[in-house]
Amino acid sequence: MSVYLDHAATTPLRECALEAWTRAQRDLAATPGNPAALHFGGRRARRMLDDAREQVACALGADIHEVIFTSGATESDALGVMAAARGMRGRDGARDLIVVSGLEHDAVSHQREVASREGFDWEVLPVDAGGVSVLPGVSGDDAPGSWDGRLALGSMTLVSSEIGTIQPVANFAALVHASGGLVHSDAAQAIPTLDVSFLELGLDLMSVGGHKVGAPAGTGVLVARRGIPMTTDRPGGGHERSIRSGTPDVAGACALAAALTEVVSERAAF
């Protein structure tokens, strides 16, 4: 019998997620409907999606209106970093700087190429010998003057996907906000083991991937604070606050909600 230990890469599908997905698919097969439609089937699908959104918000310490369903953490990272940076520069043309940690997942670090093409500067924070990001300023208490008036967005992973070190995200968020920027964090690796609260971390955006918590691959969430400027490069039908257009995967959202709810309940036993 084999024993699976590579949970940092992906996790087995939880039974609760499989049951939620199957139940939702059967309901949708019996009463088809696009959540954006006004007929009975559409309204029912919308209720299913909203119920899933509420469960996810509760699990992540967020407001229901802040939850945007995506295809996974990679898409959430791309949207969270670039859509917010574009939005900030659109509001204030001088904000052309993006600052990230040196431990970001490729989904964030590879946005550098996109950012460069669009005229953004990209700064990477150093990492100490213990695998923890080094914050700028005197003992990490002060944001550098070079950030003032220029910083559009800062991104720092909550837990490194490579070495598992916990990063000083809350302190980083305070520095970024002091410079007038927005803060994003990829929390995909942290959700199974840490108490993660979007509100308490002081974030503006947070990415979560379904397959890291026992939900199906191809499911994910971007938590985005209401009122922040975001300019997506993927216009469409206006779904998910017009940030992530496309007919939502209702069954996938239900499965993700079930998995996250179970993960949170299990953390209390650690």
What is each residue range found by the language model?
Residues 1-270:
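Pyridoxal 5′-phosphate
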